[in-house]
């Protein structure tokens, strides 16, 4: 199967996708995407991709600027640790990006998509952000 990936230049396609991301973790995930053979799963992902395209065509693309992986800092804070200033700024930036994406989706609420469940998991927290 890897021979097929090579002839399709999958690595180059995934690198182009990774270059379009705004977060290092998203770039790493994009570079590791594997083709799927489950028809139902592929159809669902294609519907999500189509819905994302339609939303961006109608309402513009949301900004993910400031999104960083703050998992380690949040775990340490949850365990009672103290965050330093760069960590606090990273958390604030991520919260700001979440609020921005959530606000963007609210502008397009009238359009139902296969992505709705993903947007519904976003929980902006302006108080904590500031």
Predicted ranges, named:
Residues 1-130:
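Conserved amphipathic alpha-helical "coupling/scaffold" segments
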